[in-house]
A protein has these predicted regions:
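Beta1-alpha1 glycine-rich phosphate/pyrophosphate-binding loop at the start
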Residues: 2-70, 152-178, 401
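FAD-binding core/adjacent interface of flavoenzyme oxidoreductases
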Residues: 2-4, 69-140, 223
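A Rossmann-like FAD-binding core segment of flavoenzymes
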Residues: 69-80, 84-85, 92, 161-251, ...
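Short hydrophobic core segments
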Residues: 10, 92-105, 209, 217-228, ...
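FAD-site-proximal beta/loop scaffold in flavoenzymes
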Residues: 114-137, 216-221, 225-303
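Internal hydrophobic alpha-helix adjacent to the cofactor/substrate pocket in enzyme cavities
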Residues: 20, 291, 299-326
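C-terminal auxiliary extensions adjacent to catalytic cores
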Residues: 337-401
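Rossmann-like NAD(P)H-binding beta-loop-alpha module
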Residues: 128-164, 169
Length: 401
């Protein structure tokens, strides 16, 4: 079948891959070009393993993407009316853009943060792995942040590098139920991780981390897991963004009203769309109106990719897309290779009273992580599983019972 529309997907993370695969599996009249800085897919949920030297996190994109995807290895520098401009000078004409650029750890407001490592991307995790291998025995490694990434990182490092001293600065699992927090503390004690909670980092010096109570922690290496930043592509392109630079999208995932991406002059016409090129945002680098419960996670990114693809298709057909309805199921945390937590949650991501903790949780977490890869491959063949509906949908259903 002759293609009628060309869609450019910027970014090949969880959301971008799912969006590309969904479009091509469902609509043979669409051509898709995926723009990504490297030819591999990076499993961000395994980057703490890369840092610890206990696992890998890459897959060839050719093994995950629909066979009709055109992969362009490069970096987008600007989204123009009906085109995406790349750093190598290439200009990709298109009828719609899926904005899926992802996120990374931000420098934040901590003085000296540039001295710290992170596990937010493959290069950073690899640099930390190399630094750990080169460090002398009994090095002091300070991990900043008691959230999910901080917990997975500090426990993985402690288990893989028992000769080093691991210190966690933060309140471990503070958003989780008390029983789960208690188990996490037990696991940290088991691994010999020192915890400094109830305090914040004032600044990072060469050889130490200074806390806001004036105390210092010796630090051969520092790892920051708190905070985030996103690429400034949306801002540079004149698209609507929030204070953090995330693309602002409506509940359909289309960029909010006021987007200056307008086709004029010789701009490629879009059948049924009028004079505005659809820009649809998915993944970590977007903020969705009316969906404050969405957190940065592959659990959200993959359904966002699917919904974003469906929105693109509806817009290309001149139809009003459906609003997003996305609910959470669980929070999975690895605490080393052989322990973990699977915390069930309500649709709005509020933790429930039920959780699986300890040895039994570790293989469940591993199965979930492997399942994300399988799900992307299934979507390329048109067989992805539906996601859980969101909290607003559940409330409406209850009101009509």
């Amino acid at each position: 079948m002759t293609t009628q529309f060309h869609v450019v997907v910027v970014g090949a993370g969880y959301a971008g891959v799912m969006a590309a695969n969904r479009l091509l599996a469902e609509h043979p009249e669409v051509a898709v070009t995926v723009v990504n800085p490297r030819p591999v897919f990076v499993e961000r949920v395994r980057l703490h393993q890369v840092a610890a030297g206990s696992g890998t996190a890459t897959h060839e994109l050719s093994d995950l993407l629909h066979p009709r995807v055109t992969l362009h290895v490069g970096t987008a520098v600007r989204i123009e009316p009906y085109a995406v401009s790349l750093a190598d000078g290439t200009v990709l004409p298109c009828d719609a853009v899926v904005y899926a650029v992802g996120s990374t750890t931000g420098s934040g407001a901590i003085p000296g943060a540039e001295k710290a490592f992170s596990v937010a991307d493959l290069d950073s995790a690899t640099a930390l792995r190399d630094a750990l291998l080169e460090a002398d025995d009994h090095a002091s490694v300070v991990v900043i942040g008691g959230g999910l990434t901080g917990l997975e990182t500090v426990t993985e490092l402690a288990q893989s590098h028992p000769r080093h001293t691991l210190v966690l600065v933060g309140d471990p699992g503070a958003a989780l139920p008390v029983n789960t927090q208690r188990y996490i503390r037990h696991r940290l004690d088991e691994l010999g991780v020192q915890v400094r909670s109830g305090t914040r980092v004032a600044h990072i010096d060469d050889g130490s981390v200074v806390l806001d109570d004036g105390s210092e922690i010796p630090a051969t290496l520092v790892v920051r897991t708190a905070g985030f930043s996103v690429p400034d592509l949306a801002r540079r392109s004149g698209l609507p963004v929030d204070d953090d630079g995330r693309l602002r999208v409506r509940d359909t995932l289309q960029a909010v009203d006021g987007s200056p991406i307008v086709g004029v002059g010789d701009g490629m016409p879009v059948v049924g769309v009028g004079d505005v090129m659809p820009v649809v945002g998915v993944g970590d680098a977007v903020v969705v109106d009316g969906n404050d419960h969405l957190r940065m996670s592959c659990q959200a990114a993959m359904p966002l990719g699917i919904h974003g693809a469906d929105t693109v298709w509806q817009l290309l057909q001149g139809r009003e897309p459906a609003p997003l309805s996305l609910g959470f199921v669980t929070t999975c945390i690895s605490l080393g290779r052989d322990r973990g937590v699977v915390q069930l949650s309500a649709r709005d991501d509020t933790p429930s009273r039920w959780a699986l903790r300890g040895r039994l949780a570790a293989p469940v977490k591993e199965a979930v992580v492997r399942g994300t890869i399988h799900t992307m491959q299934l979507q390329a063949r048109g067989r992805a599983l539906p996601s859980r509906r969101g909290p607003d949908t559940a409330a409406r259903e209850k009101a009509h019972v």
